[in-house]
Amino acid sequence: MNKKVFVSGCYDMLHSGHIAFFEEAAQQGDLYVGIGSDKTINELKARKTINSDAERLYMVNALKVVKEAWINSGGGLLDFLEELNTLKPDIFFVNTDGHTPQKEALCKEMNIEYIVSKRVPHGNLPARSTTALRQECRIPYRIDIA
């Protein structure tokens, strides 16, 4: 039986960095993905999502490396607690941006292996982050003056 690997995040503006992260996590076993709800993201990041939680769920579930994805039911930084207790994963996989002492302590308490990955782009692709993409999107391609 394969190990259960859990990851959690926003996954708004899905990009090659997310895919590389999912592929790396899936090398450890069957990949389960918890997705932050629109409400949680708005509360944590004080902004609306580009893609609704329904769209993000559809896109993440469509990826062949993902065994199952869902919208996390809780709120705050540990919005996945209920799902984590239900899934009982063997591994909680995060990248350096997603690592927090609270997640690490929770995994120790629940006897879940906690793996912190470095952000490594796939092949010769550039490093990507949603924050950087959002900043690039703010630059207008043209300016209309009325």
Show which residues each predicted segment covers.
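Nucleotidyltransferase catalytic core that binds NTPs
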Residues: 1-146
